[in-house]
């Protein structure tokens, strides 16, 4: 798939999103900062990427997801948990960055912060019914299928 990308900050020309390995699902996104950014515990900030994308095809969307090491090692996760980029969005990709940890964290310019995953989208239409056909699960939820 070819993805239209607009470089909003000239430094990003040399730091385009990239797959770390041939098996990677996500493209690494970097913090397009001019100086280190200190996040205090509990603080959330929007971090620019210096890039914009346009998927154009309503059959696709992009997800901004955390990098596992940032969350596990440093407590740095996404403030919105998952960023959803619709196919018709054309603005700068911003990363809602939340320090859920207990210590201060410093994010450096051009540090890999999140990942972008392109996913297929199915737009549903509704079929209004009075009752559903019976299923094995029914209305059971929130642990109703057991612990293990």
From Swiss-Prot:
Obligatory cofactor(s)? Mg(2+)
State the UniProt keywords alphabetically: Hydrolase, Magnesium, Metal-binding, Nucleotide metabolism
Task: Give the EC number(s) listed in the UniProt record.
Answer: 3.6.1.23
Hey, which pathway is this one from? Pyrimidine metabolism; dUMP biosynthesis; dUMP from dCTP (dUTP route): step 2/2
Q: Which GO-annotated molecular functions does the record name? A: dUTP diphosphatase activity; magnesium ion binding
**Gene Ontology terms: biological process:** dUMP biosynthetic process; dUTP catabolic process
Q: Where, in this chain's numbering, is substrate bound?
A: 67-69, 80, 84-86, 94
CDD domains from the UniProt entry? trimeric_dUTPase
Q: Does the keyword Hydrolase apply?
A: yes
Q: Catalytic activity annotated for this protein?
A: dUTP + H2O = dUMP + diphosphate + H(+)
Coiled coil region boundaries? none
Q: Which family does it belong to?
A: Belongs to the dUTPase family.
What function does this protein fulfil? This enzyme is involved in nucleotide metabolism: it produces dUMP, the immediate precursor of thymidine nucleotides and it decreases the intracellular concentration of dUTP so that uracil cannot be incorporated into DNA.
- HAMAP family assigned to the protein according to its UniProt record, in alphabetical order: dUTPase_bact (MF_00116)
Descriptive protein name = Deoxyuridine 5'-triphosphate nucleotidohydrolase
User: From which source organism is this entry?
Assistant: Paraburkholderia phymatum (strain DSM 17167 / CIP 108236 / LMG 21445 / STM815)
Q: Which gene encodes it?
A: dut
């Amino acid at each position: 798939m070819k993805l239209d990308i607009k470089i909003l900050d000239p430094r990003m020309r040399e730091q385009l999103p990239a797959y770390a390995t041939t098996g990677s699902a996500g493209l690494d996104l970097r913090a397009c900062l001019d100086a280190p950014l200190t996040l205090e515990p509990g603080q959330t900030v929007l971090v620019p990427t210096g890039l914009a994308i346009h998927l154009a095809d309503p059959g696709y969307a992009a997800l901004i997801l955390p990098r596992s090491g940032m969350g596990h090692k440093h407590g740095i996760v996404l403030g919105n948990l998952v960023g959803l980029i619709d196919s018709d969005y054309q603005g700068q990709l911003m990363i809602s960055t939340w320090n859920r940890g207990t210590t201060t964290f410093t994010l450096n310019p051009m540090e890999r912060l999140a990942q972008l995953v392109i996913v297929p989208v199915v737009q549903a239409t509704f079929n209004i019914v009075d009752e559903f056909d019976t299923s094995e699960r029914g209305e059971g939820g929130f642990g109703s299928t057991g612990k293990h």
